[in-house]
Amino acid sequence: MPRFVDRVVIHARAGNGGNGCASVHREKFKPLGGPDGGNGGRGGSVILVVDPQVHTLLDFHFHPHVVAPSGKPGAGSNRDGAAGIDLEVRVPDGTVVLDENGRMLADLVGAGTRFEAAAGGRGGLGNAALASRARKAPGFALLGEKGQERDLTLELKTVADVGLIGFPSAGKSSLVSTISAAKPKIADYPFTTLVPNLGVVSAGENTYTVADVPGLIPGASEGRGLGLDFLRHLERCAVLVHVVDCATMEPGRDPISDIEALEAELAAYTPTLQGDSALGDLASRPRAVVLNKIDVPDARELADFVRDEVAGRFGWPVYEISTVSRDGLRPLIFALWEMVKKYRDAQPVAAPRRPIIRPIPVDESGFTISSDGEGGFIVRGTRPERWIAQTDFNNDEAVGYLGDRLARLGVEDELLKRGAKPGCAVTIGDVTFDWEPQTPAGVDVTMTGRGTDIRLEQTDRVGAAERKAARRERRQPGESGGEDS
């Protein structure tokens, strides 16, 4: 039997963005070709996709690292790097995604449902994209951003209409194998079923699914036995069925006490999907009771004796069956279908809607400055930290461009207000450097000559405006001479 895994921790790492390219256009008879470095490609993202053909998380148990490809760097002649291909990871229907703190990020139900587990990094800009009127020929490019990287917990919660619960060896697996084509492991010792088993049951022209959950014992909601690991599979079941062993010889066991003990465990269990599921908690689900093994004479007598008491105390329908002689199975199959149908009819049918995208403006201009306790300062903010990651500190011009951007954002002025002195340590992101003011406060940083091509300043080529002014001056003497004559 294939190994069943319903809870794994994966390490998702998206691809990094490609670096931008710093190059100059070279062509015959064009000495001032200008910058033509292309942008880097976007890194690939890690996307979880529901696949109905996948039924377990076993692959992630052996291969927990999921890595998407990175983007390609830019090249000369304005060639942008290729974007990394998104990595689509197939997961079973009913997978719940949790973050490191146990907070639910996504509940993946339905074939084709997608969730971006890790976003790819943005590609760096080439020097062609960085060129401006004040910086005509940048000799640098921006680095690509790193892709998102985080640990995620995947939990599989079986999607079934009916969930069978009961003590070990109550006959749940036998019932599933009898009313469906499922072939679970069946034996005459407790905890034979170690994994949930799903079966598709036909009630005339209608079908529904039944889940056989491993046997529960008192204390399952606190971790005893196997119940805590598999109670989560009951969260999506619309109907819960108590399978009671009427032929048990264990002391202190009877149908009434078995049902009460299991109900106490269901009431103590807190579903992960309680706040987001339309089913509500486990205590509010419709119930049914199945008195099993009535092919044994003593078991039939006990079932006839407690049938009315169970129905009167709990108010649930009671059915007497035998998976060996198949007595009572047909009425049970159709009765469960009626309960499932009643639940399905009560669910509102969502009309197909056209998706409407309303982008939310994100203000990334904010930043905070705090003291590090040793005479230095720590700058935190989306833009400053991203700019640090994009800067090639081996390129003096790129470092100067970073300083200009920080000054325009107001970081430099705020450091001066907080008493920062030249040479003090300033930490932004993962980089700590000795701070030196770029320009005195109040001076426009774009007036600096950084990032310009000195050849453009030395050229004697006459511009269009200068030629127009020269023509105007040449006309003026002729016009005045004509008036004198």
Swiss-Prot record:
Single GO MF annotation: magnesium ion binding
Annotated binding of GTP, by residue: 166-173, 191-195, 212-215, 292-295, 322-324
Annotated Obg domain residues: 2-159
GO CC terms of this entry: cytoplasm
Renumbered residue ranges of the record's region Disordered: 450-485
Annotated OBG-type G domain residues: 160-341
Sequence similarity: Belongs to the TRAFAC class OBG-HflX-like GTPase superfamily. OBG GTPase family.
Cited HAMAP family: GTPase_Obg
Function comment: An essential GTPase which binds GTP, GDP and possibly (p)ppGpp with moderate affinity, with high nucleotide exchange rates and a fairly low GTP hydrolysis rate. Plays a role in control of the cell cycle, stress response, ribosome biogenesis and in those bacteria that undergo differentiation, in morphogenesis control.
Protein's name in the database: GTPase Obg
